[in-house]
């Protein structure tokens, strides 16, 4: 789940990997999120496993029909996918297993690769590879700890360390090979 406040009302959104993501407000009123219709991205977010908020957009991933795609909403509206208003989708070249917002970027963990999405809107979102050599075994292992991201890789626990240079990251191993 993810908490957010786009319109002055606290809400949280739940994605279960089978149904449409559901938004709950403070009075526990539920609204399903779906995408279809003119001007909207072609891929539905029904069945999303992962949902994160970054730069006032809602990002959805892990749909079984498009496991390599991230769909994002227009700014400040979790269920509007009109491409002419700032929504869109991005594909990576591996199956997505988890998402994590870290230092104002969205880290996209895949089975065999890790990517970083930077920017603040459709016009300047950029995906850069963090590594194409190792991925994440299970997205539920991605955790922020002591100012770093830790995740379970095929060879043990690893970190995505932010270095002193802005926008630069490095990978480190913190366990013996598994």
Residue ranges, per PLM feature:
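Disordered, low-complexity "stalk" and linker segments at domain junctions of extracellular
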Residues: 1-55, 59
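Surface-exposed loop/turn elements that mediate protein-protein interactions on large endomembrane-trafficking
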Residues: 20-36, 66-88, 115-126, 158-174
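Beta-sheet-dominated scaffold domains
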Residues: 3-7, 12, 56-57, 65, ...
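N-terminal beta-propeller domains
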Residues: 34-116
């Amino acid at each position: 789940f993810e908490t957010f406040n786009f319109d002055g009302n606290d809400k949280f959104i739940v994605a279960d990997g089978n149904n449409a993501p559901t938004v709950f407000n403070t009075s526990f009123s539920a609204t399903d999120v779906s995408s279809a219709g003119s001007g909207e991205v072609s891929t539905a977010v029904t069945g999303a496993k992962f949902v994160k908020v970054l730069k006032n957009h809602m990002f959805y991933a892990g749909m079984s029909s498009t496991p390599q795609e991230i769909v994002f909403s227009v700014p400040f509206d979790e269920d509007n996918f009109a491409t002419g208003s700032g929504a869109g989708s991005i594909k990576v070249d591996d199956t997505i297993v988890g998402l994590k917002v870290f230092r104002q970027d969205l880290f996209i963990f895949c089975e065999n690769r890790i990517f970083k999405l930077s920017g603040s809107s459709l016009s300047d979102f950029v995906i850069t590879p963090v590594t194409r050599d190792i991925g994440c075994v299970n997205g539920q292992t991605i955790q922020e700890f002591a100012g770093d991201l830790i995740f379970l890789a095929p060879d043990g626990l690893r970190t995505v360390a932010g270095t002193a240079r802005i926008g630069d990251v490095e990978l480190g191993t913190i366990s013996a090979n598994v």
